[in-house]
Amino acid sequence: MRVASDLRSMEIRRIGIIMNGVTGRMGTNQHLIRSIKAIRDQGGIKIGSDLTIMPDPILTGRNATKLAALAERTGIKRYTTDLDAALADPNDEVFFDASGTLQRAGFIERAVKAGKAIYCEKPTAVETSEALRLAKLCEAAGVKNGVVQDKLWLNGLRKFKMMRDQGFFGRILSVRGEFGYWVFTGEDQDQPIQRPSWNYRKEDGGGIIIDMLCHWQYVISQLFGPIQSLSCTGATHIPQRVDEQGKTYKCTTDDSCYATFALENGIICQFNSSWTVRVRRDDLLTMQVDGTHGSAIVGLRKCWVQSLGTTPRPIWNPDIEQPIDFFAGWQEVPDTTTYDNAFKIQWEEFLKHVVLDTPFPYTLREGAKGVQLAELGLQSWAERRWLDVPELE
């Protein structure tokens, strides 16, 4: 009888979510299938023994055929091409946007006017002034808001943070980040492109600097400390590519970025980001972190560490084969918990923020800091000089 009573007392709190522009790869896979659908499939977000938050999405977009196909594939019953009608429904409290960067401001403005809580992909804009304007718009309206900062919940970064918090590294000295892979140009039909063509057109909001420096801003700030200044060089190594329709087009923005960040605490971070690099490392993103008492190699899912006591003593001698196996001296940090999908974890945090007013520091204002860093990176490249990173207004 107690079990039946407990079930009757369990409140299921429905929360309607307008999911705009999720027919693309990232929106479909990470946000819809592996986040919202996964939350629904697990029975919602359980808060203690008396509350469950259950997301109820409605898919919105311009292409009714794509929306219908996605709805059928995922079992989502609600979809529409009429965004205004969706925004007018008071039963849907959250607006999520994964559309193109250049379209994001207009969608956010409409959703804020409708009183919705705002959650969106990064970058929130391509200019700092616009990103900050959107943040202030949400703040003035008093609506809860957040931006995707998924990499903070990746397994490898969480393992590193645990070791850092336990004091393993001593004083951290430097960080070397390598990100990227070879994106096929589309010129060979047996090597189809694996990134949309708009990524290589400035006029469509493309460019690896605006894309990846937004990520590095929050990764560096959260794991290592506030960024004081930066130096950045970009490049367009591949001048032309072939688009989804088989047409050759000119690349009008950067496909590679080489940036150095000086932090307020003295740590130096170097991050190379490229869609024109072939991978011979542990993962598509790796960071080497060196400290006085230990070092780490941080990947997306794994993390390896080496302590001061197990550091080998190499001697420079190019006339003989290297006697030290440098890979053998590293220890993998084991899984000590169950690691969920990074996007899903942040979705759960945001929905709890909306329903229960729990803290959620990853706001549009924080997202504007990423846009600011990217814009400063572009300026540094254009002017060929170091730039300080000022506080946002």
Q: Which role fits each region the language model picked out?
A:
Residues 4-74:
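N-terminal Rossmann-like dinucleotide-binding module
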Residues 49, 78-90:
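Short acidic low-complexity segments
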Residues 93-94, 100-101, 105-152, 167:
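Beta-strand-loop-alpha-helix segment that lines the small-molecule cofactor/substrate pocket
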Residues 120-121, 145-147, 176, 271, ...:
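Hydrophobic residues in well-ordered beta-strands that form the structural core
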Residues 143, 170-174, 379-393:
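C-terminal capping/lid region of NAD(P)-dependent oxidoreductase domains
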Residues 151-250, 384:
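Predominantly a Rossmann-like dinucleotide-binding segment in NAD(P)-dependent oxidoreductases
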Residues 211, 218-230, 234-242, 247-295, ...:
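Glycine-rich, aromatic-lined ligand/substrate-binding cores of catalytic
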Residues 242-245, 249-250, 258, 262-263, ...:
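C-terminal glycine/acidic-rich active-site capping loop/insertion
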